[in-house]
């Protein structure tokens, strides 16, 4: 006997209230999607039942003929969407209809707080789903029972979408879910068989499940003799779109299938459809979304493709077909060579899976290469949404590292913009004849990278430098050491080596070294453990000092990232480099007062650290020393 309450009134969580408001006020111009969303939910429920019934056939309850029924009642102004899928328990009803998935709650709040996203963007990211019912209905009733539970464990959910919902236990002899929409006064257009059929054909023709409606039969010659009989007929094609030849599928059909499997509100950016025949037979239909999902950076979150075996649904989120750096890809894999009862554990060590995965990766990379070459505007949209994720690729996929590297885009000193639109091929095409390295700098922000004093000699020599400021960039350059025979070189690590491009500067520096030997010793004595070394440099033209790190040590930027993530590591000390031609350095060189010299040494080091992006450990002392030097000048 259940101890659950028979009836209770509960409040939606705050995020659901916001989403309901957005749905009701932002989707009115496209209100017919409510039927697409509810049919999609029913289809998912049938897929889940099929999968769970593979290991427990009793869940079918002697009814394995899965369908979706659509009906309407003009007199009572209702539309009913009913299925015999998996159904829901009381707890699942509360979780699925009363809350946004826990993984999305925080992101939803942040987007609302920032107010950067348009309403359609919010809805696109979090999915309209069940809540779309309130576009056309002012009251929604859901009756459901989970497969395998007793008839008296049915649940009825009811809400007007304003802030609360009621739950009560009911008797429900059949498993599955029934959604009853009580339409608003202005929505009579949907109380029409032809209108509903047109929507089903437009949005849900591809649904594998039969969608059934009552058929209207007529008898006699006159309209007055028409007789309605409740005979049923299937109103969708109910076939697997992906098994059809590509030339038989319209773009709109591809788009609607994407919206169904990805639960997305927007059209996909691009897709690729492929059938492999021979020793291994499988079909893939892979999509690149137009917009990044809210949980893109959650590497532990749900991802992957829908897996079918011989057109029978097996599982959602089969992550084994795509590497982590392509986790944004949505789509379908339909294999003829896998067993129907394959488990997630078996997927991990299956040779067929590995071959299909290699094929999927190859096709997505080819699709991206085609976009990059032939549709630069669309590729720019892709890069803005998913570029940072693709940058994980060289570290994770050695076999395709060169192909991925060719798809990468960066900001650079060639363009006065933070837009990442420079490829490594572009960079190489503009290299100086004597240049043999690809130079880059990684900083906390684009502005910090662009204004770094380390760029001064490169600007003087008109040598392009890639400006990197994504958190993933340090990870990228640690695994992408060269491209087309050109090594990647950080300008923030090691000694500057421009080869033949810096002959004159090297000669000048050698002249200064003996004259500045005593000054360097004084700097080392005053700064002590704050630095690893101090030396003269020719990389500066306008700034008095800069800091760099040894070639084999972590950069300052990488160290800051590790500190932010709570990592424990041995911090590298910076190397202070001074510009022997700068007036400030010449003034300090001639400073005879030891106290003032010490202040100057601290000031010049702290200036360099600030320019590098470092946070000063004692900013108050820095300001005090600066003020004292200003008063003395």
Swiss-Prot record:
InterPro entries (UniProt xref): HATPase_C_sf (IPR036890), Heat_shock_protein_90_CS (IPR019805), HSP90_C (IPR037196), Hsp90_fam (IPR001404), Hsp90_N (IPR020575), Ribosomal_Su5_D2-typ_SF (IPR020568)
A Pfam family it matches: HSP90
GO molecular function: ATP binding; ATP hydrolysis activity; ATP-dependent protein folding chaperone; unfolded protein binding
Residue span of region C: 561-633
Region (A): 1-344
Cystine pairings recorded for this chain: none
Keyword Transmembrane: no
GO CC annotation, single: cytoplasm
NCBIfam families membership: PRK05218.1
Oligomer status and interactors: Homodimer.
HAMAP family, per database record: HSP90 (MF_00505)
Protein name: Chaperone protein HtpG
Lineage: Bacteria, Pseudomonadati, Pseudomonadota, Gammaproteobacteria, Legionellales
